[in-house]
């Protein structure tokens, strides 16, 4: 793996300092411990680790296992969190001056951010759990042979519906466009809706549709958006609408199914056109002053223990292949034992959208037509 961008090259002055530190420490601890202590002293990073993450993942309480191991090793460096509503939202924040140490876009954005100059590759050698991560997902986080994304959580964009209220004609994305449920449908407020429309309408490549295909997808969405009750950006909004009976059918994620089945008889449908699979990818901001702390945080996220906790509490899959949830129902629903569950023939792994700016512009047109 190429690229260890922040592995510090020691200057002559550093070497002299290192020798002095090692000599002093060696009197007490021996040569190996002395060297470790000296390097640790030179690479010491200050300031709280800055993490930008999705709403719902930033529950910074001691029992939150996804970073409990990090807090155990760095008890005086509790991460400071900021929220992102989407990758586009994060990008806007970066351009406005935000500079967290790391953030977590999804796999379809890896190429975009790698090319943007905003991020730098990780050094997998500093992540002890890296060897346990799903190789297919690891490869999806690479660009030009460098590891720009570290995979952790994963799941599907699919359809959630109440089986006591909704009677699908087929296992299809068509359910979120079904005229019978006007006023009871929720879509995700994202350009991914254009991709899903392309899947449903059989575009050759829904992520890179031709002009004619885009016209068809966008016109279809403009017609069907009038069926919706809600365009959700935050899961809490979807849950509130679902719990209140305002929504019966939704474009949803596995965690939405986990939460809603506590109260309603719900089905998480695997559409015949296939769901869109996503993989969360931690990315390291270029020029971060805390690269080693960022690696420690991601290493904690990548552990078997963190993976099981995430699966049990959020209903998502985890890239650590050793992690298994307590629920056999979830194990089956996400096909967690299948290392290639996120790709064909089971699902389409989300990918780069070459015409991303155009898709975003067209999605705004769709919303304006409501």
Language-model-detected regions and their locations in the chain:
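A ligand-binding cleft/hinge motif common to bilobed small-molecule-binding domains
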Residues: 108-114, 243, 248-265
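Mature extracytoplasmic/periplasmic domains
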Residues: 280, 285-347
